[in-house]
């Protein structure tokens, strides 16, 4: 029997951070900046096109030194190399973790389990490019001879969130007249609302399911099949219907038998691999709908952005390694300063779905309570990720960030040049500049606040002064980029992927399985006969029995 893992919380490095936390709690960001004129310069970093300012975080030099020491104690560098080299670090499923291989340049090779996975990746990319070119050029025609104008991606989880988020984020790069829509929820309203105004003759469905057995995805895929055939007055099972299905449905899957049974030509099936987790798969064939909308060249630029951050993460010393530092800050706030959530605030409407995407990436990865050896964790793990685009969030939940009792570290993401801009009301200014003035103001006020003396000096009624005090000392990280391009989007996603890896390594958890998700799916299948009335209500607990009985009595 293997000996249990060392307990990171019992180390001198952990103790040093506990001591440092006491020191940090007795200081302020105002003091930290006043005592170090070079703080902003020393705590600003570059990774590819991203400018990352960590200076408004609740840290001092001793904090960073202790966090780096903790990373080394946890063998972060060795674990990082194990991932990049293809070792089976997903221990519960005995799999390599190689999303980084999805964006390797064509001239590189990576042999894992006696297979050149880089060559396999580029074989699939070549087929994806051919498919996207055919759609975008009008070479691919539907059953009535019309070109395809809408690609509807049917998937769930990583097979939906990634393509949906990135297609919205890169809408400015959709130039071929093809739009993307995304269906994920098994709630029928999701499918019916997404296809209500579509012409089936000009619609193509991408069914994304690795096993082609995912309950929600297959339910929506069959709904799409019925809608498509009924709309074109085709009888299912006829040669004419089968020909139509083959021209309007493609699959992202590895189960050729199931794909063929559905009626999809397996020549139009795009595969991926067990070493790609769903939440890390947007740059695999799961991104087929994105490539169709923005084009192969932009998709390859997207991959190049990922790879640039991969190289930074793999090769940069820990002290200047941006995803490492941001991951260590996550551990710092979670385990030493008592934060339980993390806000992501993109000042870009195009990134409206980015916080939701990060919810799956971070919470499905690091929402674990046992370590890789099966023993309980000894410190809090994971953070609740949430957020909305600015300035919407300012008028919704920023009040809590500024004056509430919760410590909520926040990442602000902004861009120097917008993909869209309009003049201000007087016609002399830029709405993007107005947006970014709010961006900079929020990080400033969160950090430095406003004291009672400063408010009193403005002549405010003394009884109101306490209500207007802004305590400040609310930590933020600022991420700026020249513009939201395919490459920059890839860089942002890779940045957070490696933040997740860093945190998971410190906590000694497996960031690449999701057994909590699996059990829920299994239970749903077992309960379905009781829900539909095919069998009696006897689920094993009185609450669930009562709820299903109420549902059946009120179901119309």
Curated annotation (Swiss-Prot):
Pfam families: PGI. GO terms for biological process: gluconeogenesis; glucose 6-phosphate metabolic process; glycolytic process. The lineage of its organism: Bacteria, Bacillati, Actinomycetota, Actinomycetes, Mycobacteriales. Belongs to the GPI family. The active site is at residues 364, 395, 521. Pathway: Carbohydrate biosynthesis; gluconeogenesis; Carbohydrate degradation; glycolysis; D-glyceraldehyde 3-phosphate and glycerone phosphate from D-glucose: step 2/4. One of its GO terms (molecular function) is monosaccharide binding. Keywords: Cytoplasm, Gluconeogenesis, Glycolysis, Isomerase. It comes from the Bacteria. It is an enzyme of class 5 (isomerase). Catalyzes the reversible isomerization of glucose-6-phosphate to fructose-6-phosphate. It is found in: Cytoplasm. Its main location: cytoplasm. GO terms for cellular component: cytosol. InterPro entries: G6P_Isomerase, G6P_Isomerase_C, Phosphoglucose_isomerase_CS, SIS_dom_sf, SIS_PGI_1, SIS_PGI_2. It catalyses: alpha-D-glucose 6-phosphate = beta-D-fructose 6-phosphate. PROSITE patterns: P_GLUCOSE_ISOMERASE_1, P_GLUCOSE_ISOMERASE_2, P_GLUCOSE_ISOMERASE_3. It comes from Corynebacterium kroppenstedtii (strain DSM 44385 / JCM 11950 / CIP 105744 / CCUG 35717). This is Glucose-6-phosphate isomerase. Its EC number is 5.3.1.9.
